[in-house]
Swiss-Prot record:
Keywords: ATP-binding, Cell cycle, Cell division, Chromosome, Coiled coil, Cytoplasm, Cytoskeleton, Isomerase, Karyogamy, Microtubule, Motor protein, Nucleotide-binding, Nucleus
Effect of deleting the gene: Short mitotic metaphase spindles with splayed microtubules (MTs) increasing spindle width. Disrupts the poleward movement of kinetochores on MTs; abolishes poleward sliding along the lateral side of MTs and increases end-on pulling. During karyogamy, (the mating step where nuclei fuse), abolishes the formation of a MT bridge between the two nuclei thereby leading to a failure in nuclear fusion. Abnormal meiosis I; cells do not progress past prophase I, interhomolog recombination is abnormal and the organization of MTs is abnormal.
Provenance organism: Saccharomyces cerevisiae (strain ATCC 204508 / S288c)
Protein's GO biological process: cell division; ERAD pathway; karyogamy involved in conjugation with cellular fusion; meiotic cell cycle; microtubule-based process; mitotic cell cycle; mitotic sister chromatid cohesion; mitotic spindle midzone assembly
Protein's name according to its UniProt entry: Kinesin-like protein KAR3
Residues that, per the record, bind ATP: N386, R388, R392, E454, G477, S478, G479, K480, T481, F482, E554, K579, T694
Catalytic activity: ATP + H2O = ADP + phosphate + H(+); ATP + H2O + a kinesin associated with a microtubule at position (n) = ADP + phosphate + a kinesin associated with a microtubule at position (n-1, toward the minus end)
Other information: KAR3 contains two globular domains separated by an alpha-helical coiled coil. The N-terminal portion of KAR3 contains a microtubule association domain distinct from the kinesin-like C-terminal domain.
Broad enzyme group: isomerase
Amino acid sequence: MESLPRTPTKGRSTQHLSTPSPKNDILAMNGHKRRNTTTPPPKHTLLKPQRTDIHRHSLASQSRISMSPNRELLKNYKGTANLIYGNQKSNSGVTSFYKENVNELNRTQAILFEKKATLDLLKDELTETKEKINAVNLKFETLREEKIKIEQQLNLKNNELISIKEEFLSKKQFMNEGHEIHLKQLAASNKKELKQMENEYKTKIEKLKFMKIKQFENERASLLDKIEEVRNKITMNPSTLQEMLNDVEQKHMLEKEEWLTEYQSQWKKDIELNNKHMQEIESIKKEIENTLKPELAEKKKLLTEKRNAYEAIKVKVKEKEEETTRLRDEVALKQKTNLETLEKIKELEEYIKDTELGMKELNEILIKEETVRRTLHNELQELRGNIRVYCRIRPALKNLENSDTSLINVNEFDDNSGVQSMEVTKIQNTAQVHEFKFDKIFDQQDTNVDVFKEVGQLVQSSLDGYNVCIFAYGQTGSGKTFTMLNPGDGIIPSTISHIFNWINKLKTKGWDYKVNCEFIEIYNENIVDLLRSDNNNKEDTSIGLKHEIRHDQETKTTTITNVTSCKLESEEMVEIILKKANKLRSTASTASNEHSSRSHSIFIIHLSGSNAKTGAHSYGTLNLVDLAGSERINVSQVVGDRLRETQNINKSLSCLGDVIHALGQPDSTKRHIPFRNSKLTYLLQYSLTGDSKTLMFVNISPSSSHINETLNSLRFASKVNSTRLVSRK
C-alpha cells in the first residue's frame, strides 16, 4: 500500500512534511510554457507522493511526452489545489481529498506519458522501416541501371569492332581483286576478238590462194611429164612415136577437149567462187570499216578510260592502304581498349555476382518486409478505425435542381482531431444549423479518382487477408451507383485494377493469387444471382435451387449456395460482368428517381493468396455494396409493389444500423448481435466482426429540396461513425 502524506500540524515544521505545498506546485506548473511532444516534463510536475516505479516510467518516457492532452486534468488540479490551499487550515477533510486526487493525477500522468511514448516509438519504427525499404529499392534500381548501361557499352564496342573488320576485309578484297580481274578480262577479250577475226579472214584468203596455185601447179607438172614422155618416145622410135604421137595427139586432143571443157566449167566455177570470195572479202572489209573499226575505237577509248580509272583506283587503293594502316593502328588501340574493357568486364562480372548475392539477400529481406508491411498496414488501418464513414456530396443537376448549394458548408480537414466537419442549414421558420463530423468529406468537385485514393488502402487490406466491406448509402439519386459502378473510375472497376496491379507486383516476392467473384442482389429479402446464365430473363429462374447463406464457424468464411462464381483473370472480364449484372438488376421509377435501384447489390471478391517461398497463406473477402435508396415512404410516394420494396429496403438499412451499433457496445462480445434480422447483415456477418474493416460512403444531394433526406442520411452516418468495433472471437 502506498503511504499517504501526513497532515501538517502546528507543532511540526512544514519543511519536513511529505505533502508538497499546493501553492508552490501550482506556481511551478504555471511557470512552464506548453511543450512539444519531444520535450520531457520537468521533474517537479510529477508530485512527490507518487511511488518510485511510477517516477521511473515517467523518466523513461521523457523524450516523447506532451503535456497538451492533460490541460483539463491540470485545470481540475489547479482548482482543487486552490480550494484546498484556501481551506487547508480550517478543513482537514478537504486536505485528505486533495492528497487522494494528487496521487490519482500523478498516476494518470504517468500512464499518459507511457502511452504517448509507446505511440511515438511505433511511429519512429514505421518511419525507419519505410526509409529502409526506400533505400533498398533505390540501391537495387541503381545497380540494375549500372548493369544495363555496362552491358550496352560492351555490346556497342563489340559491334563496332566487328563492323570495322568486315568493312576492312570487304574493301581490300573488292579494290584489289575486283578491278584487276575486270581490267584483265576487258583487255583479253578485246585482243582475243580482234586477233580471232583477223586470223579467220587471213586464213580464208591464204587457203583459197594456196588451193588454186597448188591445183594449177599440179596440172602443169602432169602435162609437162606427159609431154616429156612423148618426146622420149618420138626420139626412140619415130614410127612408133609417130603412131603414138598420133594416138597421143588424138588422145591429147580428146583429153584437151575434155580438159578444156572441164577447165572452162571449172574456170567458170572458180570465177564465180572468186567473185563470191571477193564479194565476201568486200563485205568483210566493209564490216571491218563500218563496224569493227568503230568498235575498236570505242574499245580503245574504253580501254583508255579503264586505264585512267585503274590509275585512279590505284591512287584510291594507296589511300585505302594508308587508311587501312590507320585503321590497323586504331584496331590495335581498340584491342588494347577492349583488353582493358574485358578486365573491367571481369571486375564488373565479379561485382555483379556480389550484387546478385546481395540482391538475393535483399529479396529475402523484401519477402520478410512484405510480412512486416502487412502487419504495419493493418495496425495503421486499425489506428484510423475499423469502421470509417466518408461523406460525398454530388454536384447539383443542371436544369433540374436549384444551383444554390450554400446550405451545405464543408470545412477543411482537421489534422489534430483527424476528422472533417460540415454544417447543414435547414430553413423553416428559423435557420437551424446541424453540424456533422466524418473521417473524410468529398465535396462536389472531387472525382471518383480522388475517392479511390482513400478507398485503395482498404482494398489493400483485403489482399493482405482481411475481410472488408465498403457500403454506398444515401437517398435515391444521390450518386451511390455512380460512385460504385461508373465504368472506368468507379470503386468496383478501380478496385479490380488495383488488385491486378498488386498481384503482378507481389509475384516477384513469391505470392500467387486466385481471384473469384460473385454478384448478387437482395431484393425483398430474397437473394438474386446477377451472373446467372439466363440473362434474357429478368427473373431468377433457378426455381428449386434456393440461395442460402452458410457460415463456416472454423474458417470464419461465408458461402451462398447455387450462385454463379466467376474466376477473374483480367480487368476486361469485370467490364463484361458489370454490364451483364446491370441489365439484370431490379430498378423501378419512383417520385425521387426515374431509375431507382430497388435492391441492395453486393459484388463479392474472394482473394486467396499463397507464397511458395515462405509457405504463407492469406484469404480475404472484399464486399462492395451498393445499397438501395433510403428515402422515406411519404417522400417517394410509392404504392403496391414499390411500397413493399421500400419497406424491405428501410428494414434492412435499419437492421444494418442496429448491428453496427450493437457491435460498438463495450459488452458486444457477450451480448447477442442481431445479424439474422436481415439477409444483408447475415451475409456480411464475418465481414463486420473481428479484424474486418468497414467503410461507409454516405452520398447526399446539395439541393435544398432534398434537405430532409440529406439530414436523415447524415444522422444515420453519424450514428455509424460514432461506433468503435470491439474484436469478437
